[in-house]
């Protein structure tokens, strides 16, 4: 049953294929198949803006976008994220134009053999401790992104990116500042490529759940901002996407199952809904039986070999870090249940999450907006 519920993303119609279309348009050899509908539009576009709104996947838009909204009247294509559908894997897949198997960016936290610890990939901080190894993830799995590759192939062309305030490079204090900064950058350009990333509605959905009025307001505010940006820049092709969607979750606290914890070398890594487990020597058979008895109704369990042979992390050459960081087994949520290793009463649990194997988390809308040729 869990096998049937696992949604495998389409590796010919995904975020990676989108970024390869963009590479192709700007004379960079693509690494993977492109998307024909995007290729056809890009052919007539000298100014291209790729905007990613974190967590604004298909299920979120279907639930919250007002009927009379700007985006509801814009042309769109359904595409998939990657697996796992989570920010670390998906945004890096988009920016690298390669699948997670190729980039090594598989999830929020990964095991690093040389430090024998699990680190958060964006910060380098220990996931289950206080030590910080800043720069180590980038050192292991750094890559040249599509902005840099396009600039190399088109040295005279304007290429840039815009971010929330956490970024030292073009960090923007709020949504209005983000939108106006991009509009200002477009003002006098004849040819350009701009990437913009915004971190909502993801944060709001994590904290408040998919049915929250705050999430609805966020998505409709983004919609109004996009209408302003696109109408002020009619000669620009705007490609609007998300990295994933979210679902409300229920938690399974693993350290409440000592017979299961005793089989593990260390806490799980990657993601609570796509968990990587390292197993103690000789405990393989016992682990599989115990896992399936306790959690098999809610999770699909794959061995490392099965996960790789089935190409759940996408097509292409395996990054060396993947072999090191993947545990013996991968457990993929196929419903609302989510792992938590340990729970303290003072912990604030996220209401909604992503990175699992459901269609809701994976499917996206890609909007293609241009008012003039």
Which residues does each predicted region cover?
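Feature captures the catalytic ectodomains and active-site-proximal regions of enzymes
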Residues: 1-373
């Amino acid at each position: 049953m869990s096998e049937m519920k696992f949604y495998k993303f389409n590796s010919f119609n995904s975020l990676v294929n989108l970024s390869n279309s963009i590479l192709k348009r700007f004379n960079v050899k693509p690494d993977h198949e492109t998307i024909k509908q995007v290729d056809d539009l890009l052919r007539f576009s000298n100014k291209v803006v790729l905007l990613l709104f974190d967590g604004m996947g298909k299920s979120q838009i279907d639930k919250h976008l007002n009927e009379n909204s700007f985006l509801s009247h814009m042309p769109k294509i359904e595409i998939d994220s990657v697996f796992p559908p989570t920010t670390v894997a998906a945004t890096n897949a988009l920016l690298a134009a390669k699948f997670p198997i190729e980039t090594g960016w598989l999830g929020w936290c990964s095991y690093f053999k040389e430090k024998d610890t699990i680190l958060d990939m964006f910060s380098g901080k220990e996931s289950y401790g206080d030590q910080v190894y800043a720069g180590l993830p980038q050192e292991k799995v750094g890559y040249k992104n599509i902005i840099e590759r396009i600039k190399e192939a088109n040295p005279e062309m304007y290429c840039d990116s815009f971010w929330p305030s956490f970024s030292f490079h073009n960090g923007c204090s709020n949504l209005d500042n983000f939108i106006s900064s991009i509009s200002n950058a477009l003002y006098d350009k004849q040819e350009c490529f701009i990437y913009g990333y915004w971190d909502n509605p993801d944060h709001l959905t994590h904290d408040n759940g998919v049915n929250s009025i705050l999430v609805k307001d966020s998505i409709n505010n983004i919609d109004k901002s996009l209408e302003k940006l696109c109408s002020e820049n009619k000669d620009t092709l705007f490609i609007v996407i998300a990295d994933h969607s979210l679902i409300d979750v229920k938690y399974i606290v693993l350290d409440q199952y000592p017979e299961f914890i005793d089989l593990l070398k260390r806490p799980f890594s990657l993601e609570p809904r796509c968990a990587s487990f390292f197993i103690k020597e000789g405990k393989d058979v016992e682990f599989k039986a115990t896992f399936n008895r306790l959690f098999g109704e809610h999770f699909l369990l794959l061995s490392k070999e099965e996960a790789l042979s089935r190409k759940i992390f996408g097509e292409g050459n395996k990054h060396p870090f993947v072999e090191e960081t993947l545990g013996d087994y991968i457990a993929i949520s196929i419903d609302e249940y989510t792992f938590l290793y340990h729970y303290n009463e003072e912990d604030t649990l996220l209401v909604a999450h992503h990175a699992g194997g459901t269609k809701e988390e994976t499917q996206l809308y890609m909007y293609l907006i241009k008012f003039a040729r």
